[in-house]
């Protein structure tokens, strides 16, 4: 669901590269809505299908695109790691396949000896993969003439998009498909809004996901400057400053995070990693392995540099990269293989 406020304008988002290593038993209904089909011609190709599931967290039926690896049908007893890929703002559950060619990229990796995995690509609306600070107005959403998707699935009564991913989607995948079904075999990734979601969901649910990756993510939403990034950073501390930091995303983020710094800080990946460090020291689940990258011409490059500096200062291991490119599918297509390989390496030990 998008907050029913003036519709934000989508922000349009040289050669340099940096690479630094620094079960819930909810009732979920599943039904296949698309026929199985090979993702491309050839011997080692996966299949892509669409499920419709009931989400208790959102109170709505949602669509879910699922990639099954080439050997899924033949190896009837084999179990596979689960990867969850999140779309960006204004996207949908088909974008990673239709625009990102993620299925073809995964098939190519398998043909060169990569481990296989099941991939879930859920419909996240414009929900930022978080529990909103304010309850969405489903009735106003249904009356919104600009809305792009059917009201029954888009205008959800409960805006708990983090629980939807970490609980409902994972529960459906573990019960419907032959996943390995444990934390060590699950990873999550996303682009833009989905990059924010991948990192924050993994840091909020370290008992569910062992690894997370972000492409071009909104990963330091309170960052104000300097631009280009140089320490020390400046962060928004007032409502006016939060609005300035959010720019064209303000109508979304004020509904998701609120109008004061408490909600924004609680959903900041750097701050979440710092809090999780304390839980790890007290015997809690380990920190997820983290990777994130961004194009040097991307509007969010300074946010990514800030998160990299924050995690480095905290001593949180992570992999960070900058590559030529902007906030566009050409960039995400080019680098999807890197997040797949990073996640697969973490969930398979290879």
Which residues does each predicted region cover?
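Bacterial N-terminal signal peptides that target proteins for export
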Residues: 2-16
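Residues at the start of alpha-helices and the adjacent loop-to-helix junctions
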Residues: 8-9, 23, 331
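Sec-dependent N-terminal signal peptides
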Residues: 17-23
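Cleavable N-terminal signal peptides
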Residues: 18, 28-29
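Hydrophobic alpha-helical membrane-insertion segments, chiefly the h-region
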Residues: 24-25, 89
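Non-catalytic cap/lid and distal C-terminal segments of serine-dependent acyl enzymes
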Residues: 32-34, 42-350
């Amino acid at each position: 669901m998008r907050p029913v406020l003036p519709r934000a304008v989508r922000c349009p988002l040289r050669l340099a590269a940096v690479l630094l290593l620094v079960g819930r038993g909810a009732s979920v209904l599943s039904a296949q809505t698309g026929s199985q089909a090979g993702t491309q011609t050839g011997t080692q190709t996966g299949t892509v299908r669409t499920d419709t599931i009931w989400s208790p967290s959102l109170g709505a039926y949602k669509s879910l695109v699922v990639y099954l690896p080439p050997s899924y049908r033949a190896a009837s007893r084999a179990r596979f790691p689960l990867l969850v890929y999140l779309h960006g703002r204004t996207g949908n559950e088909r974008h990673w396949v239709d625009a990102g060619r993620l299925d073809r990229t995964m098939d190519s990796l398998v043909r060169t000896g990569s481990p296989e995995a099941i991939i879930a690509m859920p419909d996240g609306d414009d929900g930022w993969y978080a529990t909103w600070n304010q309850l969405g107005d489903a009735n106003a959403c249904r009356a919104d003439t600009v809305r792009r998707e059917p009201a029954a699935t888009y205008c959800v009564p409960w805006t708990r998009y983090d629980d939807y991913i970490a609980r409902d989607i994972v529960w459906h995948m573990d019960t419907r498909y032959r996943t390995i079904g444990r934390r060590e075999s699950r990873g999550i990734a996303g682009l833009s809004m989905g990059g924010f979601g991948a990192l924050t969901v993994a840091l909020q649910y370290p008992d569910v996901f062992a690894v997370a990756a972000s492409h071009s993510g909104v990963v330091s939403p309170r960052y104000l400057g300097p631009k280009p990034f140089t320490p020390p950073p400046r962060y928004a501390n007032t409502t006016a400053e939060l609005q300035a930091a959010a720019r064209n995303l303000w109508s979304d983020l004020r509904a998701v995070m609120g109008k004061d710094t408490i909600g924004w800080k609680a959903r900041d990946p750097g701050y979440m990693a710092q809090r999780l460090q304390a839980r790890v020291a007290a015997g809690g689940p380990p920190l997820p392995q983290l990777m994130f990258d961004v194009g040097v011409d991307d509007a969010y490059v300074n946010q990514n540099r800030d998160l990299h500096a924050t995690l480095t200062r905290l001593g949180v291991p992570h992999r960070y990269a900058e590559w030529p490119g902007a906030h566009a599918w050409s960039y995400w297509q080019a680098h999807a293989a890197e997040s797949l390989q990073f996640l697969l390496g973490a969930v398979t030990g290879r």
